[in-house]
UniProtKB/Swiss-Prot annotation:
Record field: compositional bias (Basic and acidic residues): 31-63
Location within or outside the cell: Cytoplasm; Nucleus
Domain Helicase C-terminal: 317-503
SUPFAM superfamilies, per database record: P-loop containing nucleoside triphosphate hydrolases, Tudor/PWWP/MBT
DEAH box, short sequence motif: residues: 211-214
Name the record gives this protein: ATP-dependent RNA helicase TDRD9
Keyword hit for Hydrolase: yes
Length: 1342
């Protein structure tokens, strides 16, 4: 069993009370060890005199101390400094020397091994030094990660026996445990950086300790730059201490050098030597006796770093050898008289990424007898899985931790004895061509590998095994990693540079420790202009600089990605601030949706459920967060146990959603400083307002994520229909590569998809199978979630396996009967009734006997499912007579109660009462079981009702065979309009009410267009005072619907029906009856199939001995996406598997209009060949929406026209062009759109008007947002919302047009200035730093 961790153990992890070997503190110069490959600076007495400034005068010192004094609140007193006994650590011996060095030098650099006491003890030395002299001080210590800052602060507070937040505290992001009396505070690097950029001085602190400086993150390097600048300008008396276990001392010392006697003198360097326990190092060529036979030591090459299968085997063999090593050590200890039991030391394996962790975990799982407990440690694993790392293993078991570089410094596991290091790391880099981020495997630096080595030897002697040769280590492994500032986007840093206001970005960043490449700075400036944080037209007229806009000032104060910050601001403009704050908080932290490795489908299903039929991860986050927040507010989750249970049921990680809630509150406070507040009326409750708000939110999301736009790829309908053999893509998936006699294992196929949903039928055809899922609700019409779950399964499990009997074995048991023709015969399996039937060669999807006698016939509409979708029955004399006979036959019988338990799709007899008449019984099917009641569907009429379960009766067997009289109908060539899609879930409430008013409970005339998947697609006509009216035309005229083409399969069916009815009318139609011999052959085949099933599926038969690998599931209607910008040309687009849209099925491939997907995160694969999208939203399929959204949110736009300039054909959107070079400013992000609907000058004018309204809510100056009243803000928000809705809902709708791309594709400045009308806002100088410039309009020849 897992054992709990005590507080004493946790304390023990930081400073183990053990003796240290070979401890030496020195200030004498000496050469570094060969393995470190770095020269260390150790200063002698003369160097010390040069490095130390002259002694300050007493009055100067008093001024410094006064500036550092903390404010005190009224009625409170600062906590006392308890006497403290320092633990025996390497750094303790020279306490006074260190204090003296720090007090006499502006900057001191300290290097010491992990566990030497730098972080925990040195700040306390200074704290006690000042306390003894009764001099105020204020110390801040930075840590690169939250977990480090919080845990160290807790440990120091506990050691000093003070309350956390009094004398000692911490601040990590939004979480702060400190008061005005706190004298020692641990913070993350970003927290201190934000404070310094805002205050532009260091004087809030007396001492600044910057820890782990070797990591060289972008934030850390910029912090060093800011500290250095301020130290030399207005904060000369503040002391700065840089600390690390592995640091290039010379580089840092020279960077912080100070001018003394007309020369630059490097900062003072002090080294602490010593480690808790010795750690022995071994390289691959020193492990020959422990390696598997045949391992090639020259496998790893610097040009292509990766892990081969052989190297995985080496690591596994090493782990197995530890038992023998420990047994030898135990025997030696017994000979010396020790009686301790051998303990199996924990193993920490460093791997570059999650894929490698999973591979290694799979390899270790084969060692079933080795008693291993394997824990993955990666940023994506759930918190529950992470906690297992710190648990004490079960006695007799060995703990194996498979970790990325997160365990280098963020997480310390104390009982690690062995470290296995592949010397690889997956580093975030910025692609030079696209500027997208990508994670690439590369060789870790020596400094990182030495940090990893330090993870062992905390409680006993340690061992480090580097899986490279010593020669490779010495000659190929780099000494230091490339600073993040040289390989990552610089957007956040550049905004802080602009806030510092100390010069243009290029000149400021040129003073960094390792200055970024000039081209990277220039590119980032352009991207800030693109996002709207810098003005597109700078007053300085410099292309690579710009004035900070109001949006830029807001973004610089928000601890979120810049696009998420823009989302918050746009959310305020359009009245959906609360939702945007939730999204920004959710996407800034680890996802609170649990996707555990063993329950991926359950997590995906939960996310789909929260999305509420909207294909958007953002909507799922909003709905899940609100569901949790509302439940807590109502007191439903008052007890932690109830909350955890709710989280488990909904696949929500409670701890993480709480963190999102904290960040949500923090962001809400931050934006309130800019006069942005959540409106009390921003939570609509009625159906129309709810969907209107949802649409506005989707547009706002798209606006914030410009230019991360992707369009849905087209599907060849004809090929897709052929591949799916005419089955419904909304309910069916395809399995390939099936073995002979595959119908014998249909139950295995069914069980493979049991987690996805209820399988209705399986159709075998050759080596393929078509698995159809059951539609549990007659009111559903879209792609089933079951289909999406099955397709997702194929992403997690690439290959499916079936246990099958060999074909020869099957034929042998046929006892001489010829069955070779059954190997790949067409077979249909009804899973519900477990009937297996062969399919005839002449089988057709259209049965003439079941067709109406004429294409035009009268029906009675009994149940409206949705607009244009309803159930009814024919009212001709023959049909009515059949219904009467069935009803009479049922109600004359003595019907028996049901003898079986209720289940969905059970055929039965149910009562129905029409008006005042007595209830009668009718044939019915169970839909849903609702406690003691049940919802039933009357199969001869098409309506549904809820009746008591006890009222159901058994359907007599002889009355099961007559065909059901009810028929499902859909109106052909009609789809929802933009108005319906925006104001409802496909259809608005007004459209639904109008359709019900027109059709419910009345007779109507229908004209049969086609029959598709059992549904009659018809033209519906009703009688009015003015005559017969087409319902579709009426709904189109009223703006509820639009005309749309039918699918390829529907068109095919239409042609078949037209031909069939023409033949019937002319007397040429001849019914095709199968011959007696064919019917006999079919019956024989059915008997043979049943005999084979009876033999091979019975419990007494031998188990299958063969394993068949089948391919799938798949769907030819699965959607692919491609980038709308130039940056992703010739790269495939992949959506991350945790996204709702990672598998999408196009249910309307006949609609050729462009559909847009937006993504919050766009990155490159390691190879650079694929674009990876994370957190996506598929926009509603409104014709012209991609063009409208792009034109609305692009910084600059140039309209395209036809040759005669009589109409607009498209637009080029992006950052515009350089007036000198005439080239595009940021060509890789330009988007060329070709209009598929007709846009007029009035539409462009409306876009400009909306951009102007946005500007009035996102600007500085006397008329800026900070100076507006809440009434004025609400008025402008309502104006923006109404303009937005009016832009997308145009009556009459914009006519279709064929897209025409410009012959000078993505070329700017093609419009003559004389043919262009420049649009200028009325600027009285009271609005500054606006977000958008207005688009010029190209004049047309009318």
């Amino acid at each position: 069993m897992h054992q709990a961790i005590t507080s004493a153990q946790i304390a023990h992890w930081f400073t183990v009370g053990a003796q240290f070997a070979n401890i030496r503190i020195t200030n004498e110069a000496k050469k570094a060890e060969a393995e470190d490959n770095a020269t260390e600076v150790r200063s002698d007495k003369a160097f010390s005199e040069l490095s130390s400034p002259e002694k300050e005068k007493s009055d100067d010192g008093n001024q410094r101390r006064k500036r550092a004094q903390l404010p005190t609140g009224p009625g409170t007193s600062p906590p006392s400094l308890a006497s403290y006994e320092y633990p025996i650590l390497p750094i303790t011996k020279n306490r006074q020397e260190l204090v003296s060095l720090i007090e006499n030098n502006s900057v001191v650099i300290i290097r010491g091994a992990t566990g030497s006491g730098k972080t925990t003890q040195l700040p306390q030395f200074i704290l006690d030094h000042y306390a003894e002299r009764n001099i105020p001080c204020n110390l801040v210590v930075t840590q690169p990660r939250k977990i480090g800052a919080t845990s160290i602060a807790r440990w120091v507070a506990r050691e000093r026996k003070c309350t956390l937040g009094s004398l000692v505290g911490y601040q990590v992001g939004l979480e702060k445990m400190a008061t005005e009396h706190t004298k020692l505070i641990y913070v993350t690097t970003g927290v201190l950086l934000q404070k310094l950029v805002s205050s532009k001085t260091l004087t809030e602190y007396s001492h600044i300790f910057i820890d782990e400086v070797h990591e060289r993150s972008e934030e850390l390097d910029f912090l060093l730059l800011v500290v250095r600048k301020l130290l030399r300008s207005n904060s000369r008396y503040v002391k700065v201490i840089l600390m690390s276990a592995t640091i290039n001392c010379i580089e840092f010392a020279e960077y912080f050098g100070s001018p003394i006697r007309n020369q630059m003198n490097p900062a003072y360097v002090f080294e602490v030597e010593g480690a808790p326990y010795a750690v022995e190092e071994y390289y691959l060529d020193e492990l020959k006796t422990m390696l598997p036979v045949g391992v090639n030591l020259d496998l790893t090459l610097p040009q292509d770093p990766y892990i081969t299968e052989e190297m995985y085997n080496v690591a596994v063999s090493l782990i197995q050898s530890f038992d023998e090593m420990e047994a030898k050590d135990h025997r030696r200890s017994e000979q010396t008289g020790s009686t301790t039991h051998p303990e199996r030391g924990s193993v920490l394996v460093f791997l570059p990424g999650l894929a490698e962790i999973q591979y290694m975990k799979e390899a270790l799982s084969k060692l079933v007898r080795k008693r291993l407990q394997v824990y993955p440690l990666h940023s994506t694993v759930t918190l529950e899985e992470q906690n297992g790392v710190f648990l004490v293993p079960v006695p007799g078991y060995r703990k194996i931790i498979l970790s990325t570089n997160i365990a280098e410094s963020s997480v310390t596991v104390p009982d690690v004895k062995y470290v296995i290091d592949f010397c690889l790391v997956r580093q975030l880099a910025c692609d030079k061509e696209t500027n997208y981020r990508c994670l690439r495997i590369t060789w870790a630096s020596k400094t990182s590998c030495n940090q990893r080595r330090g993870r062992a030897g905390r409680v006993s002697k340690g061992f480090c095994y580097r899986l490279v040769t010593r020669h490779f280590w010495e000659n190929e492994i780099p000494n230091f990693s490339i600073p993040e500032m040289l390989r990552s986007p610089l957007a956040s840093t550049l905004l802080k540079v602009k806030l510092l206001d100390m010069g243009d970005p290029r000149s400021v960043l040129s003073t960094a420790l390792t200055p970024p490449i000039l081209g990277d700075i220039e590119r980032t400036v352009l991207q800030l202009k693109q996002i709207g944080a810098l003005s597109v037209q700078s007053n300085s007229q410099r292309q690579f600089d710009g004035d900070l806009t109001f949006l830029g000032r807001v973004l610089a104060q928000l601890p979120v990605d810049l696009q998420l910050g823009k989302l918050i601001v746009l959310g305020h403009v359009f009245g959906c601030l609360e939702e945007c704050l939730i999204i920004a908080a959710s996407l800034s932290l680890k996802s609170f949706f649990a996707m555990p490795s063993l329950q991926q489908l359950a997590g995906y299903r939960s996310k789909l459920s929260f999305a509420q039929n909207v294909p958007s991860d953002f909507i799922a986050y909003v709905n899940a967060f609100k569901a949790w927040y509302t439940s807590r507010a109502k007191g439903e989750l008052r007890h932690p146990k109830d909350e955890l249970e709710w989280g488990k049921e909904n696949c929500i990680q409670i701890k993480r959603i709480r963190e999102v809630a904290e960040l949500f509150e923090d962001l809400k406070k931050r934006v309130s400083r800019f006069n942005m507040h959540i409106s009390s009326s921003s939570n609509p409750t009625d159906y129309t307002s709810l969907h209107k708000q949802r649409f506005i939110l989707q547009v706002v999301i798209a606006g914030a994520l410009f230019p991360n736009y992707f369009s849905q790829g087209e599907i060849d309908e004809q090929l897709a229909s052929k591949e799916l053999s005419g089955n419904d893509p909304k309910t069916t998936i395809l399995i390939r590569n099936l073995p002979p006699f595959a119908f014998l294992c249909y139950k295995q196929l069914q069980s493979l998809f049991r987690q996805c949903g209820q399988v209705k039928s399986i159709a075998f055809d050759g080596s393929r199978a078509y698995v159809e899922f059951h539609r549990s609700c007659v009111r559903e019409s879209g792609v089933l979630h079951e289909v999406l779950l099955a397709l997702l399964r194929s992403r997690h499990t690439p290959a499916l396996h079936l246990q099958v009997h060999h074909a020869d074995e099957v034929e042998f048991h046929a006892k001489g009967k010829p069955i070779a023709h059954l190997r790949y015969t067409r077979v249909n399996v009804d899973v519900q009734s477990h009937t297996v039937s062969p399919v005839g060669v002449l089988s057709s999807s259209v049965n003439p006997e079941k067709l109406p006698t004429s294409r035009d016939f009268v029906i009675n509409i009994t149940e409206v499912i949705d607009v244009g979708h309803f159930w009814g029955f024919q009212t001709d004399e023959n049909s009515v007579e059949k219904q009467c006979q069935l009803t009479a036959a049922l109600n004359m019988r003595d019907l028996r109660p049901l003898s079986v338990s209720l289940y969905p799709n059970l055929l039965c007899v149910a009562p129905f009462k029409d008006g005042q008449q007595m209830a009668k019984y009718y044939r019915a099917k169970v839909l849903h079981i609702l406690g003691s009641n049940v919802e039933v569907f009357f199969v001869d009429f098409g309506n549904t009702t809820v009746v008591p379960s006890s009222s159901l009766r058994e359907l007599p067997s002889d009355l099961m065979t007559p065909a059901f009289q009810a028929q499902e109908f859909c109106i052909a060539r009609m789809a929802p309009s933009a108005q319906s899609l925006i104001l409802g879930d496909r259809w608005s409430s007004r459209a639904r009410n109008r359709f019900k008013t027109l059709t419910s409970g009345r007779s109507a005339i229908v004209s049969l267009f086609s029959i598709l998947h059992g549904v009659m697609r018809v033209d519906l006509h009703i009688s009015t005072e003015t005559g017969d009216v087409s319902v579709a035309d009426l709904l189109v005229q009223e703006g509820h619907a639009c005309h749309t083409p039918e699918s390829f399969e529907s068109q095919q069916s239409h042609e078949v029906l037209i031909s069939l009815y023409e033949d019937m009318a002319s007397g040429r139609f001849t019914p095709s009856f199968a011959s007696g011999s064919l019917n006999s052959r079919m019956e024989e085949d059915k008997q043979l199939i049943n005999q084979l099933l009876l033999h091979f599926c019975s419990s007494g038969s031998s188990a299958p001995k063969c394993k068949a690998v089948v391919h799938g599931p798949s769907s030819p209607h699965k959607v692919n996406f491609h980038s709308m910008s130039k940056v992703s040309n010739f790269r495939s687009v992949n959506i991350e598997r945790d996204s709702i849209n990672c598998v999408m099925v196009n249910e309307n491939p006949q609609d050729w209009h462009e559909r847009m997907l937006v993504a919050a995160s766009v990155s490159l694969s390691a190879s650079g060949s694929r674009i990876l999208l994370k957190e996506t939203s598929l926009m509603p399929h409104i014709h012209g929406l991609p063009s409208l959204v792009t034109m609305l949110f692009t910084p600059v736009m140039e309209l395209r026209t036809n040759e005669d300039r009589t109409c607009f054909t498209g637009a080029l959107c992006g950052l515009g062009w350089n007036s000198v070079s005439q080239e595009a400013v940021l060509p890789e992000h330009d988007i060329e759109i070709a209009f598929d609907v007709k846009f007029e000058i009035e539409d462009i004018t409306e876009i400009n008007a909306l951009r102007g309204t946005v500007n009035r809510l996102v600007c500085d100056g006397p008329n800026g947002l900070l100076n507006l009243s809440q009434e004025k803000i609400s008025s402008l928000q309502e104006e923006a919302r109404e303009r937005l809705i009016r832009l997308f809902i145009k009556t009459p709708s914009r006519p279709e047009c064929t897209p025409v791309y410009h012959d000078k594709f993505k070329k700017w400045n093609l419009v003559d200035r004389s043919q262009q009308m420049e649009i200028q806002e009325k600027d009285d100088g009271k609005s500054k730093g606006v977000l958008f410039q207005l688009h010029p309009i190209t004049l047309l020849n009318m």
